[in-house]
Each structure stands twice: as C-alpha cells, then as structure tokens.
Swiss-Prot record:
Single GO term (MF): fatty-acyl-CoA binding
Entry's localization field: Cytoplasm
A UniProt-annotated Pfam family: FadR_C
PANTHER family assigned: FATTY ACID METABOLISM REGULATOR PROTEIN, TRANSCRIPTIONAL REGULATOR, GNTR FAMILY
Identification of the protein by name: Fatty acid metabolism regulator protein
Keyword Transit peptide tagged: no
Keywords of the record: Activator, Cytoplasm, DNA-binding, Fatty acid metabolism, Lipid metabolism, Repressor, Transcription, Transcription regulation
Subunit architecture: Homodimer.
Classification via InterPro entries: FA-response_TF_FadR, FadR_C, TF_FadR/GntR_C, Tscrpt_reg_HTH_GntR, WH-like_DNA-bd_sf, WH_DNA-bd_sf
Primary location: cytoplasm
Function: Multifunctional regulator of fatty acid metabolism.
Residue span(s) of domain HTH gntR-type: 11-79
Gene behind the chain: fadR
HAMAP family reported for this sequence: HTH_FadR
Length: 241
C-alpha cells in the first residue's frame, strides 16, 4: 500500500480504495492506457474486500477514470479525454498547483455561459428573471449567504432560459463553486461589489433590457478580476477539505 502521507483522508474502506486508485492513476503508478492489477491482487494490496473494490471500480468507471472490460482487465483512461467536470474537486485535491488554473477556467466558463443564457432568460421571460431576485432585499451580509444566493441565481437563470445542459454543468460544479465562493465572499468589499452587480441585473430584468445583459456581466467581471487574481494566488492548501 502507498505511504500514509500519499493517501488522502479516507473514512471508509470504499473511500480508501477510491483514493488509492485515483492517486495511483494521477501519479502514473497506473498510467493512462494500462490495465489495473487483477481484482484479487488490488483488493489485497489496498486491504479491502473484492466486493467493496468492485463497487469502487464501477463508480470510477462512471466518472471516466476507468473502462471496465468484461472478461478482460480494467483499463485506465486518460481523464482529460474521458472524464467530466464532476471530477474537478478531486483534481484540486490531488494537485493544488493546478488548482488556480482549473478554478480560473471554471470562472471563465461560467462567465461565457452566463452571457448567453441570462440574455435568453431576460429576453424571453423578463418577469421570471426578475423573480429570481425576490430574496435579494433579505440577503444576509455573510459569505455563506452570498455564496448560496450567487449559486442559485446563476443556476436558476438556466431554468428560466430553458438551458438544461447548462443547469447540469452547474450541478456538477456545485461543490467547488461553493468552496471558492466562500473564499471570495468572506471579504466585505467583494460582497459589496457583487451586491451592486445584483442590483444592476435586477434593474435590467425589470426593464426587460436583454441587450444590456452582456455588458453588465462583462463590467462586473472586469471589476472583480483583480480580487479573483489575488485569491487564486493564495489559495489555501486545505481548499478541498
């Protein structure tokens, strides 16, 4: 089994097996394109039952880490070709050096997507779009409340815009979205800047002025970019805990 320092904090045999396999893939102990050891050998090496290991392998296969070949050894995938955004939290836990780039990519994706679907939402359903800000007046001035409001606002705009694919992307990113949201919104000046953005977007929705959406989003991103740059330069090592 790997050195204890190399194993993430596992709370159960299944979690231990999953973390062992994922870290072994990431560190090229089980390189992309290779086959895993037999279930018996791997279960013995990790110290779990074959039943537990089999359940873990199936879960990792669903996430894109592995390909289970019936009657043949389980194959290790190239995660950059086979996996989806739902493994982002795992990647951040495995490699904090890559975390700023991954998070920056995620923020960029959110910005580009939101320009499109919020425009559609306001254009087609200004009243429903306005209703998304119903709780804004009661928004508590805490990092937790701002993080939750921000996530729900951007996610619910995908519902109003009838963009189910974008909604699924938000679902898959929820964990890391909330973690970095708490980092951003713990600063009062960040909350104040974002509150102003919410008020501007609320007014745009009230007026049904869809053509103003993209400019509003881009201006907010520009204003907050310096704050985000500072956050990404000093990400805490326990971000994934």
């Amino acid at each position: 089994m790997q050195n204890n320092n190399d194993i993430l904090k596992a709370q159960s045999p299944a979690a231990l097996a999953e973390e062992y396999i994922v870290k072994s893939i990431w560190q090229d102990v089980f390189p992309s394109g290779s086959n895993l050891p037999s279930e018996r050998d791997l279960a013995d090496k990790i110290g779990v039952t074959r039943t537990t290991l089999r359940e873990v392998l199936q879960r990792l296969a669903r996430d894109g880490w592995l390909t289970i070949q019936h009657g043949k050894p389980t194959k290790v995938n190239n995660i950059w070709d086979a996996a989806g955004p739902n493994i982002i939290e795992t990647l951040i836990a495995l490699d904090m050096q890559s975390a700023p780039l991954i998070i920056d990519n995620m923020l960029s994706l959110r910005s580009k997507m939101s320009e499109s679907y919020i425009y559609e939402a306001v254009k087609n359903s200004p009243q429903k779009s306005t209703a998304l800000f119903a709780e804004l007046e009661q928004l508590q001035n805490t990092a937790q409340d701002y993080t939750e409001f921000d996530y729900q606002l951007f996610r619910q705009f995908t519902v109003v815009a009838n963009k189910p694919f974008y909604r699924l992307i938000f679902n898959s990113l929820k964990g890391v979205y909330q973690r970095i949201g708490l980092l951003f919104f713990k600063e009062k000046k960040h909350r104040e800047l974002t509150k102003q953005f919410y008020l501007e977007m609320q007014q745009i929705c009230l007026e049904g002025n869809a053509d103003a959406v993209v400019d509003c989003i881009r201006k907010h991103n520009l204003r907050s970019s310096t704050y985000w740059k500072a956050i990404l330069e000093r990400l805490p090592q326990n971000l994934s805990d």
